[in-house]
Structure formats: C-alpha cells, structure tokens
Design a protein with these regions (language model features):
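Nucleotide/phosphate-binding sheet-loop regions of phosphoryl- and nucleotidyl-transfer enzymes
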Residues: 1-212
Length: 212
C-alpha cells in the first residue's frame, strides 16, 4: 500500500498499517508488531519473547518495512523479503526469518538501521489475494485495477508468479459489480476516505468468510 497524499509521518509500511488498523471498520488489518533493525541488534531475545507473547500459538508472516517502502513518498513493493507461515512455537524459525528479512536489506544496499521488520498474524482461509490500484497506474483513469490470484498463498501476485486482471469503473452502479468484488470495493472506498486520496496501491486478501 502506498497512499500518496497522506501525512508525512508515515514513512514505512508498518507506520501506515498501524494507523489504518485503528481506523478501518469494513475491512481488517491483521495484528501488527514492528521493530527496527537496530532494535533487533540490541536485544533480539526480548523481541522474540514479545512476538511469542503477542501471537502464540498462531502462525505469523515476517515482512520487510524499509524506510520509504510503501510510504507516502515512494514505493518499493516486492523489492525486499516476506516470509509466510512461521510458527511461533519454534523460536529458531522466528529468529532465522527475521535475519533473512534484514539480510535482504543489506543485499539491496539499504543498511538504514531505522528500517523495520513487520510481523503480522498469518491470515488463514484466504481464497483470493492480490494487489489493487484505485486508479490506473499509467494515467490515473477512473478504474479499480485488480491483479489477483485465486490461491491461499498471499504473495504470488506481488512476486509476479500469478496474476489475473479485472478493471471496474469507479463510478459504476454498485449493483453491477460482480459479487466477488463488492466487499473489496466497499473497503477501498473506506480507505480512500481515511487517507483522503483515491490514488492508492493496496495488497489485499479475501477469506472464505468474505473478510477483506
């Protein structure tokens, strides 16, 4: 997600999602825990303990949240690393996953100690996932552009592995929107209202219970 007209204090994916989680009603942002690379170097044992306390026994996803990645000023979606389905019952797996995400920063020559690692509860029962632009990315035409995959994996679109495409006219009557996409459109409208812009790029997942 990179809202491009929001408050300048949002410098990362973690900052943006933390703000949105407190505001969003129609959709859901999974539980969040984030920390900086410097925090990890200073006391990774405490971070591991806090992560387990917060998410146990659920599985988690460990995600990159570099300064400038999916922020107000720029987007680097898919540039770094995300690791899914990490058990909170095995400390070593958690530690290794965080180390991999941090290593990806180094490999991309971004060693900012204020880069973050974002941990969220792993969404379950996903049936559709993808990335949606709230206007066409090339010229801003009034269409929702939805790149999607009907898969339980939540990152195969951002990785470029699978992508189907549908466009929905922003001003069309709601009754003609395919049922599959109605809830997503309602959530997008709420997010646009929260950030006061209709130029957004948002990763999404839809569950069997139609939770977005």
């Amino acid at each position: 997600m990179y809202p491009n007209k929001i408050n300048k204090k949002f410098k990362s994916k973690a900052d943006t999602l933390t703000f949105l989680q407190k505001k969003l009603i129609r959709g859901k942002v999974e539980e969040i825990f984030s920390f900086t690379v410097l925090d990890w170097k200073i006391d990774k044992k405490q971070i591991i303990r806090k992560t387990i306390d917060k998410f146990y026994p659920d599985e988690i996803i460990v995600r990159s949240s570099a300064r400038g990645e999916d922020s107000v000023d720029t987007t680097e979606a898919g540039k770094y690393k995300s690791i899914q389905n990490i058990s909170t019952q095995i400390k070593k797996n958690l530690e290794n996953s965080v180390n991999e995400v941090i290593l990806a920063y180094t490999e991309k020559e971004n060693e900012n100690q204020e880069n973050q690692v974002l941990i969220q509860r792993q969404t379950t029962d996903v049936i559709t996932n993808g990335v949606v632009f709230t206007r066409t990315p090339d010229n801003g035409s009034p269409y929702y552009v939805i790149n999607f995959s009907d898969s339980k994996e939540t990152d195969n679109v951002t990785k470029g592995e699978i992508s189907n495409l549908i466009k929905i006219f922003r001003n069309c009557e709601k009754k003609i929107i395919p049922k599959k996409w109605k809830k997503l459109i309602f959530v997008l409208e709420e997010i646009e209202s929260i950030f006061e812009t209709d130029f957004l790029d948002i990763e999404f997942g839809i569950t069997k219970k139609d939770i977005v």
